[in-house]
A protein has these predicted regions:
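Formylglycine-dependent
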Residues: 2-82, 88-106, 115-118, 272, ...
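Short, solvent-exposed turn/loop segments enriched in Gly/Ser/Thr/Pro and often Arg
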Residues: 1-8, 21-25, 84-96, 148-156, ...
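Loop/turn elements at helix/coil->beta-strand transitions in domains of secreted/extracellular proteins
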Residues: 14-16, 77-84, 140-146, 189-191, ...
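Flexible glycine/proline-enriched surface loops and loop-helix/loop-strand junctions
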Residues: 48-53, 109-114, 148, 174-178, ...
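Long, internal low-complexity/basic segments
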Residues: 216, 302-309, 313-383
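C-terminal cap/loop subdomain of S1 sulfatases and analogous C-terminal strand-loop tails that border
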Residues: 17, 21-29, 156-184, 201-205, ...
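Histidine-centered active-site microenvironments of extracellular/periplasmic hydrolases
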Residues: 5-14, 94-97, 110, 133-200, ...
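A long, amphipathic alpha-helix that forms part
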Residues: 65-73, 103-144, 169, 223
Length: 383
């Protein structure tokens, strides 16, 4: 999603080791530069490794973890610090998982698509166990911070979701939240976020202070003892005091903003300011219904609010009761804060009229490499 052109490749953006697919998912291709290697599949995919394609053997998630573990081991053996960012293609459609994982769920009565969806998740769980086992084996836990998180709320493929058949005893589950991926409601943006650092933070705690991805960098900086960050470039705040136990809560005065931010090339972003957005603080979620926008039946099923709404997330985490008429002043403050945010963000929305790339870089590089020697087999590291 960050761009498939060469300047945007991870090995050109500060990463020493990059083992990636292209586009937004394995095998994807769109009418722009966003495209993976031609004909790629979840099993035995062609992967771009530090700027060159290699042919792998195995399931994509297993391969990503194996590659990362091999690199981590090399850093451990060299007594060097490391930062590993492992982003899996799964769980993402098409929903295909290793046979043993799929069978577990078909045996429980799930349809093939659902079984693939849940099988992908189980496979990630297995690989997380493999990662944690190796960190323990290599005695790295005392010096390593481990974070597990997702990038958006509940997605497709689950039991009972948008017409998917319901396996007996396994109805649709979204932790009671309203909305799915693509929605500005809680269920569209709330994700799991777990942290571990042995010997430094007390384990087994649930911290209920609302935080966001923008808080991760300030927290890392605080851990490293960096007190001053570039002004006007780094948003967010450190939640290190919560991790250390120095504080039980942080100020609840700030707002977090969400916008779906999807419009066609050449469209005026200001026309979408009041569509598919939300404002959140510790207690309330204000959800914009989308002025002058029709909400489709599919969007309603996804939890998209047809009108502006305010919810007390402490008393009503499932967003069942719109209290905007009882607290119009709260809604107005949140709407005003969002308006201020948009005015600050709009000048940063550059290249809105830039034409789509006429080429697909991964396709071009793949053809060039096939012409000049072919695609070698990837040699998996010994762990």
């Amino acid at each position: 999603h960050l761009g498939d052109e060469e300047p945007y490749q991870p090995h050109k953006r500060g990463f020493d080791e990059a083992f990636i697919h292209g586009a937004g998912g394995i095998g994807q291709a769109y009418k722009c530069s966003c495209a993976d290697a031609p004909g790629n599949k979840y099993f035995d995919p062609v992967i771009r490794h530090n700027g060159s394609f290699v042919k792998t053997k195995g399931f994509c998630t297993d391969l990503f973890f194996t590659s990362a573990l091999g690199w981590i081991k090399s850093k451990k053996d060299g007594d060097a610090p490391f930062f590993a960012y492992i982003t899996t293609n799964a769980p993402h459609g098409p929903f295909i998982a290793p046979p043993k994982n799929t069978k577990r769920f078909t045996d429980l009565g799930f349809a093939d698509k659902q079984a693939g969806f849940y099988g992908m998740i189980e496979n990630i769980d297995e690989n997380m166990g493999r990662l944690m086992g190796k960190l323990a084996e290599w005695n790295l836990y005392k010096d390593t911070i481990v974070i597990f998180m997702s990038d958006n709320g509940m997605t497709g493929g689950g039991s009972g979701r948008l017409g998917q058949p319901v396996a007996k005893g396994y109805p649709f589950f979204n932790a009671g939240m309203k909305g799915l991926k693509g929605s500005a409601d809680e269920g569209g943006v709330r994700v799991p976020f777990l942290m571990r650092w042995d010997g430094h933070w007390k384990a087994g705690r649930d911290l209920d202070t609302v935080s966001a991805h923008i808080d991760v960098l300030p927290t890392f900086a605080a851990i490293a003892g960096i007190e001053t960050l570039p002004k006007n470039q780094v948003e967010g705040r450190s939640f290190l005091p919560l991790l250390t136990g120095e504080k039980k809560t942080l100020s609840d005065s700030r707002y977090l903003f969400t916008h779906k931010a999807r419009w066609k090339t050449g469209a005026e972003p200001n026309d979408f300011q009041w569509k598919n957005f939300a404002v959140r603080n510790q207690r309330y979620r204000f959800v914009g219904g989308g002025t002058a926008i029709s909400v489709s039946e599919r969007q309603r099923k996804n939890g998209v609010s047809p009108k502006d709404a305010l919810f007390d997330m402490l008393k009503d985490p499932g967003q069942k009761t719109n209290i905007i008429d009882q607290h119009p002043e709260v809604a107005e403050k949140m709407r005003a804060a969002y308006s201020k945010f948009w005015k600050e963000a709009r000048p940063l929305m550059v290249n809105e009229n830039a034409p789509m790339s006429p080429t697909r870089p991964f396709h071009v590089w793949y053809a060039e490499q096939m012409k000049n020697g072919g695609i070698p087999d990837w040699k998996a590291p010994k762990l």
